[in-house]
C-alpha cells in the first residue's frame, strides 16, 4: 500500500507544494524560534506528501480514460490500472479525512486558505468544473501550488503576502502549467481535452510562457534590489526562448529539467531569506 501511495504522489513534484510552503514560511519568519513551532513541521509533512497524494490521486482517478493515450504515464509517472481505482479512491478519502482533522485546529482565515487549496486541487481534475479542460482557467487554477506558500506565510505572520509577490507567483505558476501542457497537446486533443496549448497552439503557448517568465524575472530582480544572484531567475524565460528560436530542441526532453531548476532556485531563495533576515542570529 505504501509503495502504491508513493507512486501516485509523483515524487518529482513534491517540491512544488512542499517547497512553496517552506519558502512562504521563510518569507514570513522573523526569528529562528519560528522554525521550532510544531505546526511548522505538521504542515511541512502535509504539503510535501499528503497534499501531493491528494492532487495527483484525484488527477489519476478522473483522468483514467484520457491517460490511456499518454506515454508519459509509463515513462515518467505511474499509470493507474482499472483494478487499482477503488484503492486509489480510498486513499483520496484518507487524505481528505486528514485534511478535515487539520482544519479543526485552524482559525477562520487559515480554514479559508486551506479550503481554497483543497477546492482547486480537487476541481482542477474533477467534474463538473474540471478546470484543466477550460482554456486560461487551466493555468489560473494552478494557483493551487502557490496556496501552500500563502498558508505558511499566514501561519507565521497572521497576514497575507504583498500583492506584487502574489502576482509574481501567478506569473510563474501559470507559465509552468502552460509549458508542462505543451508536450501533451497531441494526446489532449485526441482525448477531447481543450487545454490552453491545445486552444492557442504550441508557438503562442511558448510565447505566453516567455512573456510570463520575463515579467516574473523583472519582479524578482526588483524585489531583490538588483542583487546579482537574483538574475538567475532569467533561466526560466530561456526555456521557451530556446524552443522558439530552435527547431531542433524537443520540449519533451527539456521540460524534465524544470523541477531541478525550481528546486535549485527555491533552495537559493530560502537560504537568501534566512541570511537577509538574519534569522539564525549569527550576524
Regions found by a protein language model. Give the residues of each.
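Multi-pass alpha-helical membrane architecture of UbiA-family
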Residues: 1-283
Amino acid at each position: 500500500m505504501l509503495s502504491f501511495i508513493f507512486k501516485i504522489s509523483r515524487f518529482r513534484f513534491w517540491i512544488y507544494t512542499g517547497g512553496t510552503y517552506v519558502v512562504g514560511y521563510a518569507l514570513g519568519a522573523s526569528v529562528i524560534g519560528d522554525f521550532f513551532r510544531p505546526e511548522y513541521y505538521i504542515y511541512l509533512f502535509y504539503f510535501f506528501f499528503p497534499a501531493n497524494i491528494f492532487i495527483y490521486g484525484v488527477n489519476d482517478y478522473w483522468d483514467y480514460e484520457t491517460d490511456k493515450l499518454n506515454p508519459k504515464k509509463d515513462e515518467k509517472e505511474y499509470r493507474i490500472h482499472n483494478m487499482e481505482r477503488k484503492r486509489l479512491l480510498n486513499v483520496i478519502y484518507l487524505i481528505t479525512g486528514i485534511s478535515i482533522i487539520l482544519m479543526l485546529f485552524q482559525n477562520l482565515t487559515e480554514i479559508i486558505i486551506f479550503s481554497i487549496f483543497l477546492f482547486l486541487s480537487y476541481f482542477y481534475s474533477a467534474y463538473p468544473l474540471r478546470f484543466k479542460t477550460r482554456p486560461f482557467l487551466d493555468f489560473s487554477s494552478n494557483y493551487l501550488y502557490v496556496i501552500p506558500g500563502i498558508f505558511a506565510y499566514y501561519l507565521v505572520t497572521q497576514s497575507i503576502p504583498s500583492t506584487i509577490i502574489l502576482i509574481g507567483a501567478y506569473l510563474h505558476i501559470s507559465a509552468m502549467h502552460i509549458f508542462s501542457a505543451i508536450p501533451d497537446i497531441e494526446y489532449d486533443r485526441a482525448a477531447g481535452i481543450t487545454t490552453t496549448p491545445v486552444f492557442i497552439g504550441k508557438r503562442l503557448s511558448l510565447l505566453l510562457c516567455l512573456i510570463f517568465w520575463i515579467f516574473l524575472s523583472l519582479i524578482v530582480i526588483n524585489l531583490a534590489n538588483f542583487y546579482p544572484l537574483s538574475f538567475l531567475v532569467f533561466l526560466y524565460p530561456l526555456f521557451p526562448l530556446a524552443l522558439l528560436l530552435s527547431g531542433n530542441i524537443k520540449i519533451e526532453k527539456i521540460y524534465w529539467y524544470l523541477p531541478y531548476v525550481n528546486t535549485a532556485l527555491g533552495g537559493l531563495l530560502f537560504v537568501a531569506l534566512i541570511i537577509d533576515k538574519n534569522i539564525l542570529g549569527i550576524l
